[in-house]
Amino acid sequence: MSQETIFALASGAGRAAIAVIRISGPATRNTVTHLCGTLPPQRKSSLRRLRNRSGEILDQGIILWFAGPGSFTGEDCAELHLHGGNAVIEGMADALVDLGLRPAEAGEFTRRAFLNGKLDLTEAEAVADLIDAETSAQRRQALQQLDGGLSRQLETWTATLTRVLAWQETLIDFPDEDLPAEVDAALRTDLLLLRQEMAQALNEGAKAEKLREGLIFTILGKPNAGKSSLLNSLASRDAAIVSSQPGTTRDTIEVRLVLAGVPVTLIDTAGLRDSADSIEAEGVRRALARAESADLVLRTVDISTATEADFSAEQWPGSSEARSLMIGTKSDLPYTPPSSPDIVLVSTLTGDGMERLKTMLEAEARALTSHATGAPLTRARHRAALQDAIQHLEDAESARLEELRAEEIRLARQAVGRVTGQIGVEQILDHVFSSFCIGK
């Protein structure tokens, strides 16, 4: 355990009705005694006058303290529930520093919980995800991980690898023993099934990460194709300037939406055309770049002036394999009906077709983020470790020597252990916990 005692404002910054200051470390008990005059009963809320070292009353608030290891961090902890004025908060912070405490760094409380075995690394990350959750779907995913769902899956894989490795070591240590002939075949089958299960989890993990980070939908099309009007209609506000003059949009414009419980960044882009104007040309370049990295491209065409060629995927820049929706705008004007039934016809002026488009966008959001029941891998580092484990299992299956196979199985087990923080993670701890807010 750390010898330093830390504190931080755990509630939101700024003027509020209530402010919560969290304390953790070996000096917590003495600190609470100094502030209150006597030590309140643990795990019970107590209304006390709080004084600094000079005896000046700083506030009257509710005190909670928890003796370690039965606390969030595994250390002695306390919470001070104070009035939320800045003068009260600053006065209490000064008093705590005067008592020898120091302000906590970002994520330091959760880091101590991890180091003291109260959370594994995936559960610690879930705390950050829960704080950052914008939608109910993100909240459910974070709670599932915080509840240990991913940890239990990883423990199951680790147990399988440990069992297989034990049999493999037996084959090496006792080559002359009359072991059942089926043992080697059974080990190979176990490794194959485990690798397939991990590969499926890897695929679902990409979708879970998209849910955690949010999707990007990019609107693409020629000048005056109705892109900005479409953005404004979907956003239900005037986020982009709409004009009959071509080239009005020079840079990307982003709005944040929630579709089917999934956060989506909708991006309006410059109209696609060759231009001698360097600023407009840069806007076109950025439009193509955002479309290239998008999860879904909304290809917009002015239906009132369109030809069949305008709806051909080959006529659009970028990969023809990109996930996209073809949208015919300005359907309130006279037009020739397109031959493809997959083209969504809309009018942002009358609203015709907009509900159908929103329904289709929600379906796309669900398809891009839905995964099977279970605990998915939600971060790039999770998937990188699992990719390493899968590679080691593939190498184990093709190894000609029993010793090499055992080593690859051992390395696969270590890769799985990196996800929960059991093995070789010192170099990533700072990165993980630096993303937390102060007081968490």
UniProtKB/Swiss-Prot annotation:
SUPFAM superfamilies in the record, alphabetically?
A: P-loop containing nucleoside triphosphate hydrolases
- What residues does Mg(2+) bind to? 228, 249
Biological processes, Gene Ontology terms:
tRNA methylation; tRNA wobble uridine modification
Q: At the top level of its lineage, which domain of life is listed?
A: Bacteria
The cellular component terms of Gene Ontology attached to this UniProt record, alphabetical and capped at eight, are: cytoplasm
UniProt KW keywords: Cytoplasm, GTP-binding, Hydrolase, Magnesium, Metal-binding, Nucleotide-binding, Potassium, tRNA processing
Every TrmE-type G domain range = 214-366
Q: Which free-text remark accompanies the cofactor?
A: Binds 1 potassium ion per subunit.
What InterPro entries does the entry give? G_TrmE, GTP-bd, GTP-bd_TrmE_N, GTPase_MnmE, MnmE_dom2, MnmE_helical, P-loop_NTPase, Small_GTP-bd
Q: Name one GO molecular function term.
A: GTP binding
Q: Which family does it belong to?
A: Belongs to the TRAFAC class TrmE-Era-EngA-EngB-Septin-like GTPase superfamily. TrmE GTPase family.
SUBUNIT field: Homodimer. Heterotetramer of two MnmE and two MnmG subunits.
**Descriptive protein name:** tRNA modification GTPase MnmE
- Name its species: Granulibacter bethesdensis (strain ATCC BAA-1260 / CGDNIH1)
Q: Which gene encodes it?
A: mnmE
